[in-house]
Amino acid sequence: MLDAGADARAGDPDADADAAVARFVVITGGPGSGKSTLIDALEARGYARSHEAGRGVIQDQMAIGGHALPWCDRAAFAELMLGWEMRSHHLARRAHGPVFFDRGVPDVIGYLKLSALPVPAHLVAAAERFRYRRDVFIAPPWPEIYAQDTERKQDYAEAVRTWDAMVDTYAACGYRLIELPRASVDERCRFVLDAVTAEA
């Protein structure tokens, strides 16, 4: 969830939508592409951020012996990710300045499409209602840094397919994609901040 130091605000998520959306910066991409490492670095520079829904849900489900996991029940896993993303969106309204999202609602659509599962109407509605800054940063597949772990079980080929799915999904949702350079974390931070502050 979001580390903004505030509880969610009750009310209509459309309130102050234009001002909020301009601050909500999504960084997406395939697994193992350095996306979360970049967001960690932005957080260290004082920016608000959200945590990746997929990892959070997996950690919670494994802790309680749940089955809403990508290797058990992908549809249930997607529903929990959607709830996480919507909650993060609400929480972000209390932050000041840019908020960096480790994925967004469209990622859940991309995940279901990648899994050859139907995309329910309520998920499409969520993608229309919970919007982000139009320019979305996407981390390209990067084989030299890709690594699996206990929560990331995908192989590199699936990481590439995930990238493709996110490119298609974000474009279909009306976003403009900006590819991150395969560069150091500091260089990526400068790239993102230069782009975001240039439009501020």
Task: Indicate residue ranges for each PLM-predicted region.
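Conserved substrate/cofactor phosphate-moiety recognition/catalytic segment
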Residues: E43-W84
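Glycine-rich phosphate-binding loop used to anchor ATP phosphates in small-molecule kinases
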Residues: A78-R131, Y146
